């Protein structure tokens, strides 16, 4: 399963009742009901699913506001290319 598919699955588990499969990758997730509590739950699920640690300064909808943002963050952490904030 690719990163985006896994993120969409995790959104389904943590982001509330919404059709996450059909949300465009660049759409603001807040528009679709994502809130800060869902965001923290999602980040915890991502850390467990991908075996990564999201830096505290990257927690929040500013950095994981779209599916594309989330996938990019995961890739950067996995590749060791996450730039300091």
Residue ranges and their predicted role:
Residues 1-44, 48-85:
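Phosphopantetheine-dependent thiolation modules in NRPS/PKS and related acyl-activating systems
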């Amino acid at each position: 399963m690719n990163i985006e598919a896994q993120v969409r699955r995790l959104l389904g588990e943590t982001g509330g009742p919404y059709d996450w499969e059909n949300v465009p990758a660049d759409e603001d997730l807040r528009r679709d009901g994502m809130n800060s509590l869902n965001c923290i739950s999602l980040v915890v699920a991502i850390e467990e699913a991908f075996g990564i640690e999201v830096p505290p300064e990257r927690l929040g909808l500013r950095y994981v506001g779209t599916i594309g943002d989330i996938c990019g963050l995961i890739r950067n952490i996995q590749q060791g290319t996450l730039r300091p904030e």
